[in-house]
Design a protein with these regions (language model features):
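Residue-level recognition of single "structural anchor" positions
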Residues: 1-345
């Protein structure tokens, strides 16, 4: 069948989203409907051959097209996180719906149990593939008033006194929108990153890469931040290491975000989080936090699916081979406290 890739149906960003699981299943009942929608996301302006840029193709199977001009065969999943998957696309779509429609997301065990995946490792790998798709490399920088600070994820390791190497320093930048009439703090978007060591100059580089020049950056009194005033930023330091007021008063944004992050991570992911994969958990929190005010449940589904099409594949074996053994020193212990993640906002 000769096609020009004029796709119809399915959710359209900002226009229409599935409101319930029943609507989701009605739109995507089988692999053919899923593949057609992936093609629509991959080629929003119509099919373009990756070799010769021709705009006409023969559809040779549910997921494959053959260019009329040069004869190149193209799969709609090639180069995406679905590349060479042996699982049905409808199962992938169900996984994305499950992850995005739940307020606090899903753990690998949730995914494994609810979708009947072959193994826990498969569910774990799928989640990490999707987390890699949650952050766009070209995303906009934070603007206006931005508070920058660091916190720690983890608890005290068994048998250790004082500080613990199991705690990972996390860098936080968040837009402070102000306060409402009831004095409730209003926050904008957030950016998170894992630091190599606490209190390092890496936090200054983090501010440079996440905040738009010309914005006002608020930090603690560490001298390393003062260079920002000479690099196109307005800089205001509100506390020092011996400041009379605690950080949650002078820099309330990062402290509120850190509190929510710890509760979300502990409430949703009850297993140990490997330090080398922590950034991807932070990316998932960022994805959810920055869309927390959306009233359309399906909007997150649409955005993650859209970004999955534009994310390079990460083969299952690559993810598993890099996964550390359980109960090693690199793991981060999370206390099992209840999650009520975004209700304050």
């Amino acid at each position: 069948m000769l096609v020009s890739m004029d796709f119809v149906g399915g959710p359209v960003g900002g226009v229409d989203y599935p409101r319930t699981y029943q609507e989701f299943r009605a739109w995507f009942p089988d692999d053919a409907s899923c593949a057609a929608y992936l093609a629509r996301l991959r080629w929003p302006d119509g099919f373009r051959c990756p070799s010769c840029d021709h705009d006409r193709a023969w559809q040779t199977s549910t997921q494959h097209w053959k260019c009329v001009s040069c004869g190149r065969k193209t799969s709609v999943t090639a180069g995406t996180i679905f590349h060479r998957t042996r699982s049905p696309l409808s199962t992938w779509f169900a996984a994305i719906w499950l992850i995005t429609s739940q307020k606090n997301g899903a753990s690998a065990k949730n995914l494994h149990d609810m979708l009947g995946l072959g193994s826990y490792e498969t569910a774990w790998a799928w989640l990490h593939k999707l987390r890699r798709a949650m952050v766009r490399p070209d995303r906009e920088l934070l603007t206006d008033v931005v508070e920058v600070d660091e916190s720690f994820i983890g608890g005290r390791a068994t048998g250790k006194q004082g500080g613990s190497t199991s705690k990972a320093p996390v860098m936080i930048a968040v837009e402070n929108v102000g306060t409402e009439v009831n004095r409730k703090l209003r926050l904008g978007r957030v950016r998170l990153g894992v630091a190599d060591a606490p209190g390092s100059k890496q936090l200054v580089d983090f501010a440079r890469t996440t905040v738009e020049p010309g914005s006002l950056i608020r930090t603690d009194g560490a001298r390393m931040f003062r260079v920002l005033a000479f690099e196109g930023y307005k800089h205001e330091y509100l506390s020092g290491y011996s400041a009379p007021e605690p950080g949650h008063v002078t820099l309330p944004g990062p402290h509120r975000v850190a509190s929510l992050l710890k509760r979300w991570n502990a409430g949703t992911h009850h297993y140990r989080v490997e330090r080398e994969h922590l950034q991807y958990y932070l990316d998932e929190f960022t994805f959810r936090f920055n869309r927390r005010r959306s009233t359309a449940r399906g909007m997150l589904f649409y955005r993650l699916l859209q970004q999955s099409v534009n994310t390079d594949p990460h083969p299952l074996q690559e993810l598993i081979s890099r996964r550390p053994e359980a109960n090693v020193d690199n793991d981060i212990n999370l206390e099992p406290i209840p999650s009520n993640t975004y209700s304050e906002f």
